[in-house]
Amino acid sequence: MSETETGNDGIKLVMAIIRPDKLADVKTALAEVGAPSLTVTNVSGRGSQPAKKGQWRGEEYTVDLHQKVKIECVVADIPAGDVVDAIAEAAHTGEKGDGKIFILPVEGAVQVRTGKEGSPAV
C-alpha cells in the first residue's frame, strides 16, 4: 500500500478484523516490521460470510455473527502501509471471512506514565 493511500503524515491507527487463528501470524508479522505494540479484542460480527445454519438437540439455529479478533495498532514512526501489508499478508487465507483493515488518523496521543504527547507517546 502506498504512503499516499494511507495518508502517511502523523499518527495513524491501523485497525484490523481477522480470523482468531491468524492472530499469532499477525503478531509475528507486526513485530518483524517494527510494530510490536498492539491491542487485541475478541469481537463478533458479520461481513460477506453467509450465516451458518445448524441443528442442536433437534432444534434448528442460525449463527449469523462470526467470532473474530480486532487488532488495533497505533503507529507514528513506521509507515501505516507497511503495517497494513504485514497484516494483510499474515491474515490471508483466500477464503471469505479473512477480514478487513482500516486506517484512521489519530488527532493526538498521551503516554500516561511519562506525560509524553504526540508521536513520542506512541
Curated annotation (Swiss-Prot):
PTM info: Uridylylated on Tyr-61.
Record keywords: ATP-binding, Cytoplasm, Nucleotide-binding, Phosphoprotein
Binding residues for ATP: 39, 47-49, 74, 97-100
UniProt cross-references to PROSITE patterns, sorted A to Z: PII_GLNB_CTER, PII_GLNB_DOM
Regulation: induction: Highly expressed during ammonium starvation under nitrate-rich conditions.
Subcellular location: Cytoplasm
GO BP annotations, alphabetical order: regulation of nitrogen utilization
Listed SMART domains: P-II
Single GO MF descriptor: enzyme regulator activity
Pfam assignment, any one: P-II
Residue(s) carrying O-UMP-tyrosine: 61
Residues binding ADP, per UniProt: 39, 47-49, 74, 97-100
Protein purpose: Involved in the regulation of nitrogen metabolism. Regulates the activity of its targets by protein-protein interaction in response to the nitrogen status of the cell. Increases the activity of the glutamine synthetase 3 in the presence of 2-oxoglutarate. May regulate the activity of the ammonia channel Amt1 via direct interaction.
Family membership noted in the UniProt record: Belongs to the P(II) protein family.
Quaternary data: Homotrimer. Interacts with the glutamine synthetase 3 (GS3) in the presence of 2-oxoglutarate. Interacts with Amt1 after ammonium shock.
PANTHER family for the chain: NITROGEN REGULATORY PROTEIN P-II, NITROGEN REGULATORY PROTEIN P-II HOMOLOG
Protein name: Nitrogen regulatory protein GlnK1
